[in-house]
From Swiss-Prot:
GO molecular function list: transcription coregulator activity
Subunit structure: Component of the Mediator complex.
Extent of Basic residues compositional bias: 319-328
Protein's recorded name: Mediator of RNA polymerase II transcription subunit 6
Database matches in Gene3D superfamilies: Mediator complex, subunit Med6 (3.10.450.580)
Keyword annotations from UniProtKB, A to Z: Activator, Nucleus, Transcription, Transcription regulation
Example of a GO biological process term: regulation of transcription by RNA polymerase II
InterPro entries according to UniProt: Mediator_Med6 (IPR007018), Mediator_Med6_fun (IPR016612), Mediator_Med6_sf (IPR038566)
Species classification: Eukaryota, Fungi, Dikarya, Ascomycota, Pezizomycotina
Keyword Transcription regulation in record: yes
Region ranges (Disordered): 173-212, 251-328
GO cellular component term, pick one: mediator complex
Protein source organism: Aspergillus oryzae (strain ATCC 42149 / RIB 40) (Yellow koji mold)
Family, as annotated: Belongs to the Mediator complex subunit 6 family.
Job of this protein: Component of the Mediator complex, a coactivator involved in the regulated transcription of nearly all RNA polymerase II-dependent genes. Mediator functions as a bridge to convey information from gene-specific regulatory proteins to the basal RNA polymerase II transcription machinery. Mediator is recruited to promoters by direct interactions with regulatory proteins and serves as a scaffold for the assembly of a functional preinitiation complex with RNA polymerase II and the general transcription factors.
């Protein structure tokens, strides 16, 4: 409940020109706390309210409300909730020190705090909230959690809006992939609408002829090399076809039409025919061997035959015929 009330108090502004006129027409150090006591930010159960009521009915305590120094000095002797001035622009302007980098402002800073007495030690003070008095307007300073939460909410809201807008932008094409902006085709026809507005008023300088030729040397050389390679590949393929076009890798080549191929037996037939051929048949293209001359045995009277000489086949046949005649 208290946090909800503090959250609502951070959003309001309070001012009362009538009370300013009743207090002399302007705010100063001795009436700033009493002007603050008229605002909704003030707590009636604080020590400030108790001391003011006691001073109204007790003459011995009246001097405590005449000056702010006396009033805050009396509050320091009490414990509980209190409101004190943390920054006085009039006192800052009256100081002779030149420690201020800028001119003193007219902003008053008032703190709401609790004081607890400790025996033999200084009082324990806990600041609950801070208020600003600008002119006759009173504001409540937001807490750190409120400031950080507001900034986070603003950032998240902006990111949510961005994601909603960006979710409809990406598109996918096989040529470019995922892109947020589809590639726009470049206009090539000068007769299209808007082409005249894109043209430059001044003549575009043309590149030199030498530089243009130098740029074309590379592509022309690459094209010539590709054409030469294609021609060489075609010639090699044609040569392989002419040399090995009639050969088969299978022993039994396939014959027939697609869908009804059969294995032929021409390979087996050719091997059988080759094995039956005589070995002395000269192959085409081979050199024929020389035919041996038959030897003729001549018997010379009075001369013994040479050792190691063997009768020929014709001599053996003649001897056999003679023996057969003698036997008859």
């Amino acid at each position: 409940m208290a946090s909800a009330q503090d959250g609502s108090m951070e959003e309001i502004l309070w001012r009362s020109p009538a009370h300013v006129q009743m207090m002399g027409g302007f705010l100063h150090s001795n009436n700033i706390l009493f002007y603050f006591a008229e605002s909704p930010f003030f707590d009636a159960t604080s020590n400030n309210a108790s001391l003011a009521i006691q001073a109204n009915y007790n003459e011995t305590l009246r001097h405590f409300v005449e000056t702010r120094e006396a009033f805050e000095g009396r509050l320091k002797t009490m414990q509980g909730l209190e409101f004190v001035v943390a920054y006085d622009p009039l006192q800052a302007a009256a100081q002779t020190e030149t420690s201020f980098a800028h001119e003193p402002s007219n902003i008053w800073v008032i703190r709401k705090q609790t004081r607890r007495k400790r025996a033999g030690l200084e009082d324990e003070v806990v600041v609950l909230s801070t208020y600003f008095v600008v002119g006759d307007c009173i504001y409540m300073a937001p807490s750190v959690a409120s400031v950080v939460g507001n900034r986070l909410l603003s950032a998240v809201t902006s990111l949510t809006s961005l994601l909603k807008t960006a979710s409809s932008l990406p598109s996918f094409t096989p040529s470019h992939g995922h892109t947020y902006l589809p590639p726009a085709p470049k206009p090539t026809d000068s007769s299209q609408p808007g082409a005249q507005s894109q043209q430059s008023k001044e003549n575009t300088p043309m590149p030199d002829a030498d530089s243009t030729k130098a740029l074309l040397v590379g592509p022309q050389t690459a094209n010539a090399g590709a054409i030469l390679q294609d021609t060489r590949t075609f010639a090699e393929s044609f040569s392989l076809l002419a040399r090995y076009g009639e050969e088969f890798m299978d022993e039994n080549p396939l014959v027939g039409e697609p869908g009804s191929f059969i294995l032929s037996k021409s390979g087996d037939t050719d091997r059988g025919a080759a094995s039956k051929q005589p070995s002395n048949v000269n192959r085409p293209g081979s050199i024929p061997g020389k035919v041996g001359t038959p030897q003729v045995k001549v018997d010379t009277p009075g001369k013994t035959p040479e050792k190691g000489a063997t009768p020929s086949a014709s001599d053996d046949s003649k001897i056999r015929k003679k023996k057969a005649k003698i036997g008859n």
